[in-house]
Amino acid sequence: MSGAGKHALASSLRGTRGDRTLAPFGRRRLPVVARETHGPYVVLGVADPDGPAPDPGQFAMLAAAERWGGGEDERPFLPRAFSVARRHGDGRLDFVLEDVGPGTERLCALEPGDDVWLLGPLGRGFAPPDPGPPARRPVLVGGGVGIAPLMIWSDALGDATTLLGFRDAAHAAGAALIPGARVATDDGSVGHHGLVTELLAPELGPGAEVYACGPPPMLEAVRALCAEHDVPAQLALESGMACGFGACFGCVVPTRDGYVRLCVDGPVLDAAALAEVG
């Protein structure tokens, strides 16, 4: 994007959702204290006892303190954005990772005793359900590694219908992270044979309020279904981010009211604000 283009984009963004504290708690070096696997997913536990409690749906920027080659100046250079999946009583933060490239490969290889650089919590999380009347019925919809923000949100809500979609049985091992969830797999190897949105449609009755995170095609299907049934929905969008606090404009997405940066105005957006996802 040209300098003039960035200036115009910055002008269109200014004031859209109010001012932000860009990096409210600073970057800090923290130890990895837990690691477990669920199929292709790695759940990494990071000790952050003095850090602020994240809101469900917020994220953090993570990078291995020691990169490939053993030095702090080795590749990969940039951190990666991950939803906070869970916060334990001792301040431990859990993150759900999947090895899909150099940055996540390095993070997935970390073990207890290694350190990470963490910046967060960042962004806007899920807004609580409308208290009614009528009482709202939360429905959580996740796809793949998009289960992460639904874990902490499910913990906070306590009582919600959770629907999870995965590629196959190996990936569906991640469903164990949200007990009681109903599962759909593309190949029919676990649960419903088909898309998770096929499980969602019957749930869109009176009082339903949807919260979703997953790949763009899934989120677009959720958005369209909820619009068709006049059901409110909040979508946690995924995007590559270089900074996490609004400086790089790498996570800009269009809405009905103009462009927003997912790292400061999201990653959770009202579905009604989006004409389309992806």
Regions found by a protein language model. Give the residues of each.
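Nucleotide-activated chemistry modules centered on ATP-dependent adenylation/adenylyltransferase
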Residues: 219, 225, 245, 269-278
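Ferredoxin-reductase
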Residues: 13-114
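Short, basic/aromatic-enriched C-terminal tail that caps enzymatic domains
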Residues: 198, 259-278
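Local cysteine-cluster metal-coordination motifs and their immediate loop/turn environment
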Residues: 149, 216-217, 238-267
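FNR/FR-type flavoprotein reductase catalytic core
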Residues: 102-240
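Short, low-complexity, intrinsically disordered N-terminal peptides in bacterial proteins
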Residues: 1-29, 131-135, 275-278
